[in-house]
């Protein structure tokens, strides 16, 4: 029996192509891309999203993750004086490049996007447009869930909004905006009225609290969208 089982195993491996074998061996069922907020150094990786990233990885055994490499700058000298708009444009391009490349390597892996503040904005751009190219085709289809927290693109009335904000962020989407090409059903965007960046509040500390306040809700949403 053992010999027969081993023979069947070797036969199945021989029948599989090299790409299929590589995917079986190295591609997880779930992979997370996360983007940090403005002024947080690249060495800090995920920034404020870290606890949520770790929660998602705990929920899906074997899940992988990586931080988007981009300036996360707002004009300050510590990040090279790169303007906020330039940083967001670079970040958006980095998201599209990283997700597309990963999908080409691991086409069956389900992808989750998580972004905080400017990091949320670049994920927003990659899915919904606004700063260069967006995700398209198979790479877009691989994204099963996206979480934006404190996204300055926030505008009241968008179908994926969560939280108490009834106004808009400092880089708000225009009136009548429609997210495209992504399906809005895969997105949740968290913003509260106290936040001066994604809304019109005056409590900058609240801007850092979304994982604490909504982390469990965001995790539940992700779990409802990912089938692994």
Residue positions per predicted region:
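Short, solvent-exposed loop/turn and secondary-structure capping segments
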Residues: 43-46, 125-126, 157-161
């Amino acid at each position: 029996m053992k010999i027969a089982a081993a023979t069947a195993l070797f036969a199945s491996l021989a029948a599989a192509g090299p790409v299929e074998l590589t995917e079986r061996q190295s591609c997880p069922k779930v992979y997370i891309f996360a983007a940090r907020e403005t002024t947080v150094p690249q060495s800090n990786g995920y920034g404020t999203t870290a606890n949520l990233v770790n929660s998602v990885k705990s929920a899906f055994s074997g899940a992988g993750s990586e931080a988007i490499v981009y300036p996360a700058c707002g004009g300050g000298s510590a990040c090279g004086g790169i303007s906020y708009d330039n940083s967001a444009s670079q970040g958006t391009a980095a998201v599209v490049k990283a997700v597309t490349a990963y999908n080409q390597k691991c086409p069956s892996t389900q992808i989750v996007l998580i972004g905080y503040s400017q990091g949320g904005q670049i994920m927003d751009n990659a899915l919904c447009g606004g700063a260069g190219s967006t995700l398209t085709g198979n790479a877009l289809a691989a994204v099963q869930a996206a979480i934006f927290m404190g996204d300055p693109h926030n505008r009241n009335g968008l179908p994926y909004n969560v939280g108490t904000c009834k106004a808009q962020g400092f880089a708000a989407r225009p009136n009548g905006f429609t997210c495209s090409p992504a399906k809005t059903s895969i997105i949740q965007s968290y913003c509260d009225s106290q936040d001066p960046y994604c809304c019109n509040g005056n409590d900058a500390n609240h801007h850092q609290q979304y994982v604490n306040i909504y982390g469990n809700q965001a995790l539940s949403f992700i779990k409802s969208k990912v089938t692994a």
